[in-house]
């Protein structure tokens, strides 16, 4: 099991394949994505790597985190994410991951925070059909209707779909295809839409349902810290 990467959503565009068909893609950018810490079975009881991405001003970084970054000899990061990995896929601290970590044609799982929509009704939030246009219905055409049963249970069931806050939730979209990568510019082009707004942090992993393709680099496609 390999590590994933932390990327930033740039936006959407389209590219053309060899047949001249256009493919809608989301552009993800890797910015200064480095290994900040390791978790080992002997010391922590599990195996993982902690990645950091982006840049944060020193004055805005808590003192404890400054020491954490200094121990890894990396500059303060804007985003930290921990990835579970197998023991043979541990990555050296300070190494920088590149867009070549993924190969064209492979499937990935993408996690992000969806765009917040504020308070929304049942029709917009859950695709309800609403009430009838006439025949006794007035002023409540877009309401969700009955929410309960009878004297028993005498309450509204937990999880009942009703109006409420829509969006701004952690969502994972599975099995998105990597159309292409640009290692020099740190870009990953993923087919289709990715949850989150422009500029938001996105976590990209090998698709759990399809596994890691044979051509993917192990333990990762890295650029050694000292070569920068």
From Swiss-Prot:
PTM description: Methylated by PrmB.
GO molecular function: rRNA binding; structural constituent of ribosome
PROSITE patterns in the record: RIBOSOMAL_L3
BP-aspect Gene Ontology terms: translation
Residues with N5-methylglutamine modification: 151
Taxonomic superkingdom: Bacteria
GO cellular component: cytosolic large ribosomal subunit
UniProt keyword annotations, A-Z: Methylation, Ribonucleoprotein, Ribosomal protein, RNA-binding, rRNA-binding
Keyword match RNA-binding: yes
Function: One of the primary rRNA binding proteins, it binds directly near the 3'-end of the 23S rRNA, where it nucleates assembly of the 50S subunit.
NCBIfam families recorded: L3_bact (TIGR03625)
Family in the record: Belongs to the universal ribosomal protein uL3 family.
Complex formation: Part of the 50S ribosomal subunit. Forms a cluster with proteins L14 and L19.
HAMAP family membership: Ribosomal_uL3_B
Entry protein name: Large ribosomal subunit protein uL3
Source organism (scientific name): Sinorhizobium medicae (strain WSM419) (Ensifer medicae)
